[in-house]
Amino acid sequence: MATKKKIGLVLSGGGMHGFAQIGAIKVLEKYNIKPDLIVGSSVGALVGAVLAAGLKMDDVEDALLNENLLKLIKPTFGPGLIKGEAISRFALRTIKVSKFDELKTRLIINATNLSKSKEVVFEKGPLLPALTASISIPGIFTPVNHNDDLLVDGGFYDVIPLHLAEDMDIIIIIDVSNLDYKITPKSGVLDIMKQSVVNLQRRIIELNLRAHVKTHEILMICPNVSEYSMFEYKRSRQKEMIKLGEDEARKVLGDIRARKILGL
């Protein structure tokens, strides 16, 4: 009898583009695709925690669309404009879980250690600091003080932390990072800074894919969310992103290669 292949699900960062991840996962659920491991960066960490706790995406969609997400934004003073902890606490209240070992599916979350210029990986202990660190975009969210180090958004080290799923056989990536950013001769200083970060992120993704494509079966679900802001709070637009995620997942999973890999 053939050994069942282990499936890893890797969820990228991307701010409010995470609504498209919810849509894509709804399709995975309909195909009864259950990951053995979930890896999340930034918003992917939040979506991943909810999925790892065993919640269905239809219920998550209802909870989010019925919540005033703007009230979770807590202005602050210091090395960031917003405290991200309220967002993490909302996620934990929703899933009624506070520690990694209480989750139903193994979860790994990444963050960036600014103090030591390296990646931090969370898979044990309390979820709150891990989630808060992973979503803390520098300059917008206050960094998390963890063991006297400052931690920020995991996407600044690796927005698609594919390497954290290398012990899996099949890796499904849901990428909503939207690295299609372009600058023009009229672009300002902030645009140029953003493009520099995007170029670095693209290079890291390319190197990761090259390193794993020969040893793993990889499926990529990449909803086109380029026309949506990473800070999209309009409900109608959030619903549109969920639909985009569903449509792209159906397209990818309907492909002959994907069906063969997943045994559909």
Q: For the regions a protein language model found, what residue spans apply to each?
A:
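Patatin-like phospholipase
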Residues: M1-S41, A49-L264
